Amino acid sequence: MNIKANDARRPVSIVVIGAGNRANKYLEYAKINPDKVQLVGVVELNDIRRNKVAERFGLDASQCCSDYKTFFHNPVKSDAILICTPENMHFEPSMMAIRKGFHVLLEKPIAQTLEECIAIGKAAKEKGVIVAVCHVLRYHPYFMKIKELIDTEELGCLLYTSDAADEA
């Protein structure tokens, strides 16, 4: 399941766990870049979302699963697992993927506690797999402009910042 250096010319095969809004952003990339990324499986509790992804990528029933615990008993062969579950559900599927030898691309936060984060890191090191964390907004023009303003001190020397978002 590990990617070898001589495999660089083929697409990276992935299974996505959690097929909500964030996952669909990554899947847009996979759809327009099939030479780089190939979706080979979807794990999603919600039937409608799971079926929508399956239809969009031509996945059959053997490539779809309603829960990750069942999936990891007989996983679809792939290079990596993309974990896009809700924030409080990152640890267990990450550990299961690592134990099975998959590389993991994980939405932030890595886990809910420092101990869980350390456990993921240790398990990945022991198994020889890569765990990468998505920080995609750091390259969004909005945030790049903020970084530029801070770096140039155009607005003065920044001493403190606070942010709040309406989740509605």
Give residue spans per PLM region.
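Rossmann-fold dehydrogenase core element
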Residues: 119-136
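Single conserved hydrophobic/aromatic residue that forms the stacking wall/gate
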Residues: 160-168
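Aromatic/hydrophobic pocket-lining residues that form π-stacking "cages" and hydrophobic walls in ligand
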Residues: 50, 93, 120, 146, ...
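Beta-loop-alpha module in the N-terminal Rossmann-like domain of NAD(P)-dependent dehydrogenases
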Residues: 62-123
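Short strand-turn motif at the edge of the Rossmann-like AdoMet-binding core
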Residues: 108-109, 135-137
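Oxidoreductase and adenylate-handling cofactor-binding alpha/beta cores
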Residues: 139-159
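N-terminal Rossmann-like dinucleotide-binding module
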Residues: 1-58
